């Protein structure tokens, strides 16, 4: 059981890290491989519950990686269910600082989502996957199992290995 839980956690961390890299973070010698893998993850509609919704569904490249819909709220993976707000652009998400109070400006700076509820890109990347309205997965284990069934899972293992540096 411990090994299975560790593997699921590693899968989840790898997924989040790869998606973050694909959104514009500088990479090392395997950067292009990581970017290609991130693109696959970003567009994979099998990672939602029910299948059919990907990150790209709400963050369209044709709209600056923001929602294509011109309404205040977005429909999630389940038809007829809407989130509390529309999807913002993820175009510069890799460059947003962690949420903090700036004494000089006497204001909060950074954080992701419209309300800053996610302090970092790494934290933000997993939230839609587990949101019951957005991508509908019940837990990290469910996401990890789906990732293991993808045709690109072996690429994840080749790039990150099956270690702590891997997966969710």
Locate each region found by the language model:
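N-terminal export/targeting leaders of redox proteins
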Residues: 1-36
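Periplasmic c-type cytochrome electron-transfer domains
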Residues: 23-168
